Amino acid sequence: MDGQSEEVDALVQKITGLHAAIAKLPSLSPSPDVDALFTDLVTACVPPSPVDVTKLAPEAQAMREGLIRLCSEAEGKLEAHYSDMLAAFDNPLDHLGVFPYYSNYINLSKLEYELLARYVPGRHRPARVAFIGSGPLPFSSYVLAARHLPDTVFDNYDLCGAANDRATRLFRADKDVGARMSFHTADVADLTDELATYDVVFLAALVGMAAEDKAKVIAHLGAHMADGAALVARHGARGFLYPIVDPQDIGRGGFEVLAVCHPDDDVVNSVIIAQKSNDVHEYGLGSGRGGRYARGTVVPVVSPPCRFGEMVADVTQKREEFANAEVAF
């Protein structure tokens, strides 16, 4: 067995053990035990690794799929918990730093804005943006609106009405960003004509848990978004925390893939930048010619400088912040 295979086996074994421990928890609501296990999971998954989750053995694949479902449930409970905590303040937006991972959203949103400006320059100052899968803590929309897109209107969509109610409460005291932020309870599969009104659509990592579901969502967006509109799709190239997105599925969905970014820091989402292709009207979806990879050239795969050492220190600090915030709440 070569060194790379040993590294992959060691990582899969470690994550399998964490999955078993997480699955035994009586609840995934925030608690010291939950926070510690998921912090260990993130610490294990974030460093660059040669593992290819598409080539895992069936048993490991089943473990990975179960782990992603647990991560989704835990993330929802974590965000609901902190959304309620923030809503207790007179102006919740003044206290977003109470959420231990808020800095990750700042970094991810900055990265996405810079990628849009670089690869889709005509869309980096959009008039209207849709965020699909915004959840009870719509930090991404807020950071983009407050720091990068001061004139843009944001429509946030989520399946969960309770999540949208929580999100709405966070903006009640803000007359600037709050006036440009709206929340809608809807399934993306039911959105049609409204999708054509957006210059940019952001697709959250947890929308479409299985690969075939993700591909259906992307094809639906490709059928209804305006020609030239940009798609920003988040996914988990590290594979154990979030579903992965195959760029080929984005191409088949009617988009031109412009760039793929795999961050090497504590941002756990990879990002794909794509643009709705005019070809979809000529050839149709499912023809294999509805979209393509970056104008017939090799798609740029970009990555910020690695700062894993800083990330380990950040994770330790965040574990302490979790404990302190829960005591205060």
Curated annotation (Swiss-Prot):
Its EC number is 2.5.1.43. It is an enzyme of class 2 (transferase). It catalyses: 3 S-adenosyl-L-methionine = nicotianamine + 3 S-methyl-5'-thioadenosine + 3 H(+). The keyword Transmembrane helix does not apply. GO terms for biological process: nicotianamine biosynthetic process. Keywords: S-adenosyl-L-methionine, Transferase. GO terms for molecular function: nicotianamine synthase activity. The keyword S-adenosyl-L-methionine applies. It holds the Pfam family NAS. Synthesizes nicotianamine, a polyamine that is the first intermediate in the synthesis of the phytosiderophores of the mugineic acid type found in gramineae which serves as a sensor for the physiological iron status within the plant, and/or might be involved in the transport of iron. Belongs to the nicotianamine synthase (NAS)-like family. This is Probable nicotianamine synthase 4. It comes from Hordeum vulgare.
